Amino acid sequence: MPGLALLGLTALLGLTALLDHGEGATSCLSQQLRMQGDYVLGGLFPLGSAEGTGLGDGLQPNATVCTRFSSLGLLWALAVKMAVEEINNGSALLPGLHLGYDLFDTCSEPMVAMKPSLVFMAKAGSCSIAAYCNYTQYQPRVLAVIGPHSSELALVTGKFFSFFLVPQVSYGASTDRLSNREIFPSFFRTVPSDQVQVAAMVELLEELGWNWVAAVGSDDEYGRQGLSLFSGLASARGICIAHEGLVPLPPGSLRLGALQGLLRQVNQSSVQVVVLFSSAHAARTLFSYSIRCKLSPKVWVASEAWLTSDLVMTLPGMPGVGTVLGFLQQGAPMPEFPSYVRTRLALAADPAFCASLDAEQPGLEEHVVGPRCPQCDHVTLENLSAGLLHHQTFAAYAAVYGVAQALHNTLRCNASGCPRREPVRPWQLLENMYNVSFRARGLALQFDASGNVNVDYDLKLWVWQDPTPELRTVGTFKGRLELWRSQMCWHTPGKQQPVSQCSRQCKEGQVRRVKGFHSCCYNCVDCKAGSYQRNPDDLLCTQCDQDQWSPDRSTRCFARKPMFLAWGEPAVLLLLALLALALGLALAALGLFLWHSDSPLVQASGGPRACFGLACLGLVCLSVLLFPGQPGPASCLAQQPLFHLPLTGCLSTFFLQAAEIFVGSELPPSWAEKMRGRLRGPWAWLVVLLAMLAEAALCAWYLVAFPPEVVTDWRVLPTEALVHCHVHSWISFGLVHATNAMLAFLCFLGTFLVQSRPGRYNGARGLTFAMLAYFITWISFVPLFANVHVAYQPAVQMGTILLCALGILATFHLPKCYLLLQRPELNTPEFFLEDNARAQGSSWGQGRGESGQKQVTPDPVTSPQ
């Protein structure tokens, strides 16, 4: 293309002229900050800065003198110029149209920034703002504004431009207040909100285990808002701020004494990490004092505003402050930008080119806003080389493409051109700025509902080199932090990652007991059994569910296993052996009694009733089989009835025999004979039946009124769930024993004081000892059952039943078995039947005399008296 060839030749000649002029040569670079077009974009850039800041020092509204030069501000302005020229030279966005630009210096001062802002809002073709009731048809000099760079300035200009609904796109203002659409409806930016940067900072602190930090901000809108956001989010995430303060502005402020006190507190505490959310000027002030006070090396988490600032990087003594980390927004590479800057400088040094600018752009209105950028006309490539790759350059560049895309949509441009129509007014452009998607250098961007863009961050680390540190990428933040630990290095003693915690991390199974006002200062307390530590930051132990358990210092709960009196337990096996013994003895005695059923001994013991009592005693022994194993509803209901009814049957036979002995010894002979006849006849079985019916009625009442049920007790055992039969009323449980206790008591009363005749079998003694065995076992049962662990209560009841049965067998039945087996010569009517033998002596004698052999003894119960 001949135009590009001519431009390249001109740039080459200009570059030669620039080298010939040297460093002190004057150029016309400031004149390149303005270009006419169909639509003009205003620009606010920090091309310089003033020595004294603030309005309090002046008594008159005089002009602020900007003496310092900012190379970054000029580079951002040149990036906007480059973007406009690319759009004008291309046909993708605004074919047939030319954008213009009008770029001014803000001097980093709100008062200075307002002057060009007023010029921007002047009516097209004039230098003043007309007063109207309705500005709908008002056409200002600019269609949109790019800038300013700082939050402090954007808060001032943002309200001003929002009144006219003029779109404003900042390339550096990040305070979250600017996202408020109620106050700043026309504000947009190509940098993320501070809220995103703060979230990245907090996640970095969490990832590195730093929860005891100091937080410092600059005493301006950017620092105060950022510090407020950080404090709120850090507290919500369990990060404690040990010290907090503001760096006063300007540097000569009388409040710097408070800053020195803050630095001394940080130096004397265990804080090893300082979050510094401030402007570059405030950061330089802080580090100047920290170097002077010889603050020990710390880790400085930097905000984006000062992380790449030459004001801070070039401060003498900075390598001794420690490690500096911070987040920078990502952007698309701009490899052509350094070449473009060199070309602009070369052209600015060309007198012919400068003369052409004077002819094309007469009257720069310097009488209104002052010199546009006098320092720019003395700049050299060496002055700008350090900031050529600054990350914010792309943000300024992308801002132009965002406005151009919205204008493209407003004009409904296509490949052939943009349809002619009335000039677009700022408020019409604003309608198409909301949620607009655009591309800059291949990177897709979009303004969201709050005017922010979705740009990710790189985590940068200062690696100290001479003269300024190198920025090394050690991680990224794309909604979540990704840290590259292998790339990190620590400028601290020992080159080890510093620890910044008020208290050590609690061990597993411990929770924090906060001491003082900071949640990060705490004592570690063990979680007791039955509770556990759910999360490392828990302040209280979490109780396990009732079906779970945990040991001391646990981090989880375990399921409780059901526990009951299992068949395989040693105690149960011992009781089963005892059962076998008792049942074996009862069956052996029953068999022996049946074999000798007609003998005087068996007849004296009750005959069939004695066999019935032994059978019931065997059933009593078998009832213990209902206690082992997992309890069920049926087994719980059957335990007491199946034990008490057989025992009642056994004791009722004893009662009849005791009554017979009592009658024979205590009543007159005539009455005794009558009563014996009744006690030995069919009426005796009626007594047994009535006793068992009475016990059955008690058992039925017990099961209906207070039915035992299967319950699972979760707390009685430390690691298991006890499954057992629960007794609702111990009074009713005792009343079920009433029938048996009464029978045993009557037996004892009827036999205790009875005297046997010499040479006769003492049947009363066996009954007395049998009842004593009953009472001893069941009286011992009460305190033992009440004090033993509930898990072993079924075993206690089993043992009591078996001991009771064995006691009855040992005191009443086994002595008779001994006589049957070892002393058969005593098994005679004279020894056992007493009065019956005397009453029927002739019958016994005749029977034995006639046959000469032993005769069958008649049943004393059924034989005639």
From Swiss-Prot:
Topology term for the membrane: Multi-pass membrane protein
SUPFAM superfamilies assigned: Periplasmic binding protein-like I
Membrane spanning stretches: 574-594, 607-627, 643-663, 686-706, 733-753, 766-786, 795-815
Entry superkingdom: Eukaryota
Glycan attachment points: 134, 267
Keywords noted in UniProt: Cell membrane, G-protein coupled receptor, Glycoprotein, Membrane, Receptor, Signal, Transducer, Transmembrane, Transmembrane helix
Range of residues in the leader sequence: 1-24
Coiled-coil regions, chain positions: none
Family to which this protein belongs: Belongs to the G-protein coupled receptor 3 family. TAS1R subfamily.
Function noted in UniProt: Putative taste receptor. TAS1R1/TAS1R3 responds to the umami taste stimulus (the taste of monosodium glutamate).
Other facts: Unlike most mammals domestic cats do not prefer and are unable to detect the sweetness of sugars. This is due to pseudogenization of the TAS1R2 gene which prevents the formation of the heterodimeric sweet taste receptor TAS1R2/TAS1R3. This molecular change was very likely an important event in the evolution of the cat's carnivorous behavior.
Name of the protein this chain belongs to: Taste receptor type 1 member 3
Gene name of the encoded protein: TAS1R3
